[in-house]
Design a protein with these regions (language model features):
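A short, histidine- and acid-enriched strand-loop-helix "catalytic/donor-clamping" loop
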Residues: 9-14, 60-64, 105-134, 153, ...
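Nucleotide-sugar-dependent glycosyltransferase donor-binding/catalytic pocket residues
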Residues: 13, 62, 93, 184, ...
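A short, active-site helix/loop in glycosyltransferases that binds the activated sugar's phosphate group
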Residues: 141, 148-176, 183-186
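Conserved donor-binding/catalytic core segment of Leloir-type glycosyltransferases
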Residues: 181-183, 193-211, 216-217
Length: 218
């Protein structure tokens, strides 16, 4: 039996997007811990219902205070060390950066990261990036150059992302895998027949200019 630690931020991501992976690990007899920094009591109950063990920790997802992040990383490493896992799996930008560093401090044997996308700082904007966003991007790239080489494996979903991040900024990673789209569990998100005869158009994306919201409105 292995102990596997998942490090995310928003608690709902565990039961919305990681449930099948957690079920598969539990079925194989492994113990799964779900680290979340943004949660409610109801969220923690839903994680328990999956069969995973919820663990709360502190990490400001949008914070830019380096001292705060250093303290959070140290505290996170202590929590990881108490569990003594065989593997740490982080997803989302900040958990991949600080979760990886914390896992290495805790001497975890294997550390894996999943980047589902590079985020708005790496997205071309109709207008140039603001100076603040440019600064955030520089900080993010610097932190990636520190953290990503520590990973045993880095998984991407978008086949363009390895070039846009690793090649563009000369970041060395031990092993890279492009998984592609992870899809939906159709037993959970079941097909429903069209209940309206009217033709309608739906915009499924974040309300950002680079996602095409202006084109959709026009």
């Amino acid at each position: 039996m292995y102990k596997v630690v998942f490090i995310g931020t928003v608690a709902s991501s565990f039961y919305s997007f990681r449930a099948d992976l957690i079920y598969a690990l539990l079925k194989q007899g492994h113990e799964v811990y779900a680290f979340t920094s943004e949660y409610t009591a109801e969220d923690l109950k839903k994680i328990e219902h999956l069969g995973a063990i919820p663990v709360t920790y502190t990490l400001n997802r949008g914070g830019l205070n380096p001292l705060e992040d250093i303290v959070a990383t140290y505290q996170l490493s202590k929590k990881i060390k108490e569990i003594n896992p065989n593997l740490v799996f982080s997803y989302f930008s900040k958990p991949i950066i600080f979760g990886t560093l914390a896992a290495k401090l805790a001497k975890v044997p294997r550390v894996i990261g999943l980047l589902e996308g590079l985020g708005y700082t790496f997205t071309e904007q109709p207008e140039r990036l603001s100076k603040k966003i440019q600064l955030i991007k520089k900080i993010q790239v610097f932190l990636y150059t520190l953290a990503l080489p520590q990973l045993d494996q880095l998984i991407f979903l978008n086949p363009d992302d390895p070039h846009d991040l690793l090649d563009q900024y000369s970041i060395k990673v031990k092993k890279v895998e492009v998984l592609g789209g992870i899809g939906l569990n159709l037993n959970h998100y079941k097909f429903s027949t069209n209940f309206s005869s009217n033709i309608s158009f739906i915009f499924i994306a974040r309300l950002l200019a680079e996602k095409g919201i202006h084109d959709y409105i026009k």
